[in-house]
Amino acid sequence: PKDYYNEKSSNSVKIDTNSNKAINKAIKKVIKKNKLLTNQNVKQKLTDFGIKNKEEKILIRTEFGDIKIRLYKNTPLHRANFLLLAKSNFFDSTIFYRVIRDFMIQGGNSDKNNMLQKMAKIGLYRVPPEINSKNIHKRGALAMAVQEQYYKDPTKINLSSSPYNFYIIQKGPLSDT
C-alpha cells in the first residue's frame, strides 16, 4: 500500500524534534522584513503563508515513534500557523510536557530559554478562533490550546488560540461542555 505520509509528497511536512535545520526561506523573509506576527497582522500574514504552503499532512517524529497528523483546510489560519512553526523548526527539541491519561498530550512551547528566543523571532500574537462543528475532538485530533490568561478570568473569555501550544486528543470524542 502507498504510504500516505510519504516524505516526498508536496502536501506533507516532517517535524523532526531532534534536528537543527536551517530556517525555511519563507520564514527568513518574514523575519528580515520586520514582519513579526502581531495580533494586528496575524490574519493577513497567516493567510498569505497558507496560500504559499499548502501542506495538509504532518509527521511528528519522537523518540517513542511517529505521529501522523492531518491539518484541516477549513481552519486555514491554524493550519498555516502550525506549518509556519514547523517549517521554522520551532518545535525541534521541544517536548510533550503535559500528558493526561485518556484525555490528551500537550506540546509545543516549554519553559526552555531557547523557546523565548524562538518566539521573539516569530512574534507575539494569538490565532483568531476558527470554530467549526465538523471538526470533532476525537482520538488523534490536533488542536491549539486556548491562551491561558483568558480562561483564568471568566469575564474576559477569548477563544483565540495560543500559537505555540498544541495538543493531541488521546480519547474521544470530547464535548465543549
Give each language-model segment a name:
Residues 1-177:
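Cyclophilin-like peptidyl-prolyl cis-trans isomerases
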